[in-house]
Swiss-Prot record:
Annotated gene: fam53b
Stretches with biased composition (Polar residues): 212-236, 326-342
Gene knockout outcome: Loss of posterior structures and beta-catenin (ctnnb1)-dependent gene transcription due to the absence of accumulation of beta-catenin (ctnnb1) in the nucleus. Fishes show reduced regenerative outgrowth following amputation due to decreased cell proliferation.
Protein name: Protein FAM53B
Key word Secreted present: no
Organism: Danio rerio
Source taxonomy: Eukaryota, Metazoa, Chordata, Craniata, Vertebrata
Induction of synthesis: Following amputation, expressed in regenerating tissues.
Amino acid sequence: MCVAMVIIHTKTLEKKAVDDVTSEASLQPQEPLTMSQGTALFSCGIMDSGRWADVGSVCGVQQRPVGSSLESLWDSMREAGATGGISGLLRDLSLSEASPASAAPPSKRQCRSLSCSDELGCRSSWRPQGSRVWTTVEKRRCHSGGSVQRGVFNPSGFPAMQRSSSFSLPAHSSHLEPFTHGFPFQAFSECPQTPQTLYRSHEQICPAEASSPESTPELQRRSGQSGLARSRSQPCVHNHQKIGVKRRRPADSHKQRPSLDLLKMTQKLQDFHSLSCPGFSGDDKTLPSSSPALLNDTCERAQNDSSADAPIHQSESSSEDALIHQSDSSSADALIHQSESSRPAGKERECLWAGLCSRRGRDLFQLGGELDIEQIERN
């Protein structure tokens, strides 16, 4: 191995001495070649045919006879140092001119869920067109009244988000300020925070603050009363106690309802006469002393109002009064029936109450305790 290394070293020294003249001419500093402004990977522009020879000399492309394997290996290692200028030039070109990377569209799952993933925002600024599956952010409206507006997209790829006061982002959204107001190089200087998602389901909802006696004065009262029970109007309080329990009514509610009085419905004739004739009771079988005069007065008034011939009715009423006072009960009944039959048919109802009330005990129990339907209809 040592002998082989010595042979290789001597051969390289000989070749180096021969190629010193050509290498000095090629390693001199030359003017940079004019590059085009395109986005091609190896964009050397449009050059003349004479310049391709210069590029070939710079790149170290030389026609050499094929030698042994060791010589070709050593030559390729030496040419790698000469081609460092081209690789550095290409590296500077890629850094100075940032070409937009063509990123792939999101997966089908992201399109269906209509979600703005964090990985997609960090990778690229690819924005799809409006379609049925994917809806753009500016067309989506929040139901609570807050609108989402899409800001200017920076070269870093993060959108500047603005929201209305009714639906705001969490408190740490201030980290997005370098991306909206600064240059892209200033934005990359800080550690980038992941952009907040634009939908309510992904946002972190801050828990409510613990209630204190200052904020809720009812807590102090409840603590003093050793904890008040919940209201009975809420059905979830005593659900465990209500299984199989029937509602019991208080004992006072079982009161006897008023029943129908059948005795009043089957009244006798004496009760009917006691109700229809004032001043006359069923137990008392005699008329009071003033009742005939009162009944005669009512009959006279009815006759004066209803009849057209006043003198005829006055004579009839006077004759009836004389007959009633003079005769007994039997003769009075016969005269009353005769006078009723002698009158016209339209005047039968005039002195009806007088005849009814003038009857004595024989007439009271004449029907045997049954109601006279014809007399009820006449009344």
